[in-house]
Amino acid sequence: MNALLTNPFKERLRKGEVQIGLWLSSTTSYMAEIAATSGYDWLLIDGEHAPNTIQDLYHQLQAVAPYASQPVIRPVEGSKSLIKQVLDIGAQTLLIPMVDTADQARQVVSATRYPPYGERGVGASVARAARWGRIENYMAQVNDSLCLLVQVESKTALDNLDEILDVEGIDGVFIGPADLSASLGYPDNAGHPEVQRIIETSIRRIRAAGKAAGFLAVAPDMAQQCLAWGANFVAVGVDTMLYSDALDQRLAMFKSGKNGPRIKGSY
């Protein structure tokens, strides 16, 4: 395989290694590069809740490329046309939100594969992914380097988890705590004991099926708990939340009546 197509993030998942990540919601290549120099194993570049365009995602991929931190792109949804664009700009690992059924999971897999294995549109000669046609036999090699992660974040998805885990081409399943807790009737309360129980059992089911299990935890104790349950790709913070907390803490040192960071929700 061409060295440009190697995917260290996927290789480490296959080995069952734990990888610690950071969520990037700031939408700038400058902030992405700062994060990449910190040494996180992976960086989630968010196109679902952060206002990133395809060009924004592209520039952030360029910014982190020289560093060891591995980029993961989350598009706003899992449509075939959007997945095609994100792959063409050079993303190798995708996190697809709101996957509720095995059929949805199969459609997402198909969108990432070239024919005859899927429906990805052919345009590598004009795309960064193939270095504008300079990677020989790109189409024959790329499937092995792509890593596909799907988010389970609703009661419906939980009911269908075993079927989703059976879909060939899914490398890992990410538990979305904020949407999941809301779907279960505990909005903005991912720490509720029932939600915690479901998160634990889901992580254990994912790992038992031979897939990687992922999670985002903005509280360090929750991140440690998920790691103890077996999650092996865990994001331990969000750049914008860490930035705003740091600003509040610094201001509190010099302004009377300021008590440090305000509560900003579970995500």
UniProtKB/Swiss-Prot annotation:
<feature type="binding site">
    <location>
        <position position="178"/>
    </location>
    <ligand>
        <name>substrate</name>
    </ligand>
</feature>
<feature type="active site" description="Proton acceptor">
    <location>
        <position position="49"/>
    </location>
</feature>
<feature type="binding site">
    <location>
        <position position="179"/>
    </location>
    <ligand>
        <name>substrate</name>
    </ligand>
</feature>
<dbReference type="InterPro" id="IPR023593">
    <property type="entry name" value="KDR_aldolase"/>
</dbReference>
<keyword id="KW-0460">Magnesium</keyword>
<comment type="function">
    <text>Catalyzes the reversible retro-aldol cleavage of 2-keto-3-deoxy-L-rhamnonate (KDR) to pyruvate and lactaldehyde.</text>
</comment>
<dbReference type="InterPro" id="IPR005000">
    <property type="entry name" value="Aldolase/citrate-lyase_domain"/>
</dbReference>
<comment type="similarity">
    <text>Belongs to the HpcH/HpaI aldolase family. KDR aldolase subfamily.</text>
</comment>
<dbReference type="InterPro" id="IPR015813">
    <property type="entry name" value="Pyrv/PenolPyrv_kinase-like_dom"/>
</dbReference>
<feature type="binding site">
    <location>
        <position position="179"/>
    </location>
    <ligand>
        <name>Mg(2+)</name>
    </ligand>
</feature>
<dbReference type="Pfam" id="PF03328">
    <property type="entry name" value="HpcH_HpaI"/>
</dbReference>
<dbReference type="GO" id="GO:0000287">
    <property type="term" value="F:magnesium ion binding"/>
</dbReference>
<feature type="binding site">
    <location>
        <position position="151"/>
    </location>
    <ligand>
        <name>substrate</name>
    </ligand>
</feature>
<dbReference type="InterPro" id="IPR050251">
    <property type="entry name" value="HpcH-HpaI_aldolase"/>
</dbReference>
<dbReference type="GO" id="GO:0005737">
    <property type="term" value="C:cytoplasm"/>
</dbReference>
<protein>
    <recommendedName>
        <fullName>2-keto-3-deoxy-L-rhamnonate aldolase</fullName>
        <ecNumber>4.1.2.53</ecNumber>
    </recommendedName>
</protein>
<comment type="subunit">
    <text>Homohexamer.</text>
</comment>
<dbReference type="GO" id="GO:0106099">
    <property type="term" value="F:2-keto-3-deoxy-L-rhamnonate aldolase activity"/>
</dbReference>
<feature type="site" description="Increases basicity of active site His">
    <location>
        <position position="88"/>
    </location>
</feature>
<keyword id="KW-0456">Lyase</keyword>
<feature type="site" description="Transition state stabilizer">
    <location>
        <position position="74"/>
    </location>
</feature>
<keyword id="KW-0479">Metal-binding</keyword>
<feature type="binding site">
    <location>
        <position position="153"/>
    </location>
    <ligand>
        <name>Mg(2+)</name>
    </ligand>
</feature>
<dbReference type="InterPro" id="IPR040442">
    <property type="entry name" value="Pyrv_kinase-like_dom_sf"/>
</dbReference>
